[in-house]
Amino acid sequence: MKKIFTALLAAGCLVACTSKKTAYEQYTELYDNVVAQLETVEDRAAKDSIIDNFVTEGYTLLLENVQDVTSDSIVLNIFYMLSPEQKAELFAAIPAERLQMPVLEPVYKEYQIELKTSAGNPYIDITSLKADGSALSLSELVGKTEYVLVDFWASWCGPCRRLMPVLKELYESYHPSGKLEILGVSCDRDEAAWLKAVEEDELPWLHIRDQRAEPYNPCDQYGISAIPTTVLINRDGVIVARNPNEAEIEEILNK
């Protein structure tokens, strides 16, 4: 009887162990549920709330299963939605040898570049082409006004386009007095789409477009993993904020 009971326990364990879902399978279920929810909602605020909850739940799942190698695929899916604090916690938890593997190495390198271009660091000079084909460098602007705001965006990016009225208001308020310059850095592949968006949104500041090849690759140089991304640089060439909101920008400019 004891042998039979032991055999049943072993069989039960085998079924339980083999039926346990991997971290990525659990994440896929979570993702599918969120997609289904989004299809039933029209309100933008409600959609944003669903996505925020998804990121929170996905990140929690990721941390709980960080030793599961299938979680590497979750990192690739969710990395671009994480906060700087979450990224720091995540990469500290992942075994160092996995960060050097082909799956995670690219996003880990992006994260390291983000760290180098976070608040408190000296800015990295970038150069790319304007609409007329001439080159413009960030170093030509830094020091000419109190602050330079670099805005990484694209014509196809809804949140980027919705940010433009805010930036226009800041520009109109602070540019005439020499407080603020803005440099738009487009991540568009399509030059015509970029130029059309600049014209449609009536953006009065300077613009360049990432050419996706050195030396005209500013998005790579600043580790841009999601847009819009803004970087605020002071007269001394020090980054004072990365992705500040409108209130934070105004607080800095009004000091």
Describe the role of every protein-language-model region.
Residues 84-130, 136-145, 172, 192-199, ...:
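N-proximal helix/coil linker or "cap" segments that precede and/or mark the start of modular domains
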Residues 172-215, 224-227:
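Conserved segment of the thioredoxin-like fold in thiol-based oxidoreductases
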Residues 2-7:
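Sec-dependent signal peptide recognition
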